[in-house]
UniProtKB/Swiss-Prot annotation:
Task performed by this protein: Putative antitoxin component of a type II toxin-antitoxin (TA) system; however the expected toxin coding sequence is not found adjacent to this gene.
GO molecular function, one term: DNA-binding transcription factor activity
Family note: Belongs to the phD/YefM antitoxin family.
GO biological process, one term: regulation of DNA-templated transcription
Swiss-Prot/TrEMBL keywords: Coiled coil, Toxin-antitoxin system
Source organism, top-level taxon: Bacteria
Pfam families (UniProt xref): PhdYeFM_antitox (PF02604)
UniProt protein name: Putative antitoxin Rv0268c
Residue ranges, annotated region (Disordered): 1-35
InterPro entries membership: Antitoxin_Phd/YefM, phD/YefM_antitoxin, YefM-like_sf
Coiled-coil region list: 120-153
Basic residues bias spans: 1-11
Length: 169
């Protein structure tokens, strides 16, 4: 940055008769511009791109975002109106080591395999899987019959039939 080519120095000598140097203020401004944001992200541009100003605050924002991301939204609490969750949460790394034990546990209870704090897969027993598939097939059959016959029913009756309290939803 501070070194000048020989040809440029020679040109300055010839034009003035002595060595000319650029003012220190312009050099400082040029260096300061390099240290800050790129030209397309100056002053009001920071707001348009939703970046913090000055640039040194960016690392703090990322740190805060990282910290909040570790509190995953999948907790053992049940959502309003949902069924209680009676499954055990197991990290995938532990599941690799104890797969046979987890398969035995899945006969009694569902096992949720977690990857980085988020549910990745659910291990259920073969009987439960078959019953869920049968129930799904029955519901699809009922839906196709209702669609063919254009049957309508009140929402309260439908909620009672499905076992859902419509007033709470």
């Amino acid at each position: 940055m501070g070194t000048r080519s020989k040809s440029r120095t020679r040109q300055l000598k010839q034009s003035n008769g002595c060595t000319a140097t650029t003012s220190g203020a312009s050099d400082r401004r040029r260096r300061a511009r390099r240290r800050t944001a790129p030209a397309w992200l100056r002053e009001d541009e920071w707001l348009r791109h939703h970046l913090p100003h000055p640039p040194r605050q960016l690392s703090r924002c990322l740190h805060r975002r990282r910290r909040s991301a570790c509190h995953h939204r999948y907790s053992r609490r049940t959502p309003k109106g949902g069924l209680p969750m009676t499954s055990s949460l197991v990290p995938i790394s532990e599941a690799r080591a104890h797969l046979s034990r987890l398969v035995r546990e899945s006969a009694d209870d569902d096992v949720v395999l977690m990857n980085h704090g988020r549910p990745a897969a659910i291990l259920i027993s073969a009987e439960r899987y078959e019953s869920l598939m049968e129930e799904l097939e029955d519901l699809r059959d009922r839906l196709s019959v209702h669609e063919r016959e254009h049957v309508t029913m009140p929402l309260d009756k439908l909620g009672a039939e499905l076992g859902v309290d419509i007033g709470r939803v």
